[in-house]
Amino acid sequence: MMISHKIKEGKPMTHIARDDAITLLKKYNQDPFHIQHALTVEAVMKWYAKELGYGDDAEYWGIVGLLHDIDFELYPDEHCIKAPELLREGGVGEDIIHAVCSHGYGITVGCGKTIDVEPVHEMEKVLFAADELTGLVWAAALMRPSKSTKDMELKSLKKKYKSKGFAAGCSREVIERGADQLGWELDKLLTMTLEAMKATEDELSLIHISEPTRLQLIS
């Protein structure tokens, strides 16, 4: 499956209101963990947009983050394959669809297909790189006495990152490919994503996570 539409010069081609995006997300996702992850990636993407000079498009970057896993709960074996259908039914434009699908680039999903929608714009590359990493940072925060990212140092995150058994579901290979696509050293990606999560933690109320969700994060 290939979607040829590309974001032109990083400018939003279409827009869906955030309230409508939330409604669309919840139409296909009920698990609190999946909703929390979507909100986390939304907040991190908005932070990156502002940090990287795309502040005028921060809401747009956030919507892409919010909807990026729209098909994962109901169609895990068709992740990034079923998404275009669900998004088009919700009135979402092809630029957002391309961005959503591109975060699965090079990944073979359960049905045996490999996603070939390549991240092109910096926004898409950030989504690819930061998606998995937000889960790892979050899991690391929950292991701390404070249950917070705010007092987490980079060296602590790197220690967890290097422990292959920790948050094993967060693919280091994907994270490192993401850093490469951005032309960044891994340390830069780790540093910036940690800073993004520190900056947005109060908004996301990371310390108020139920035990079942906590277990999902660290498994």
Located regions from the model:
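Methionine residue identity
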Residues: 1-2
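Acidic/His-rich, divalent-metal-binding segments that scaffold phosphate/diphosphate chemistry
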Residues: 5-75
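Divalent-cation-assisted or electrostatically stabilized phosphate/pyrophosphate-binding catalytic cores
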Residues: 149-191
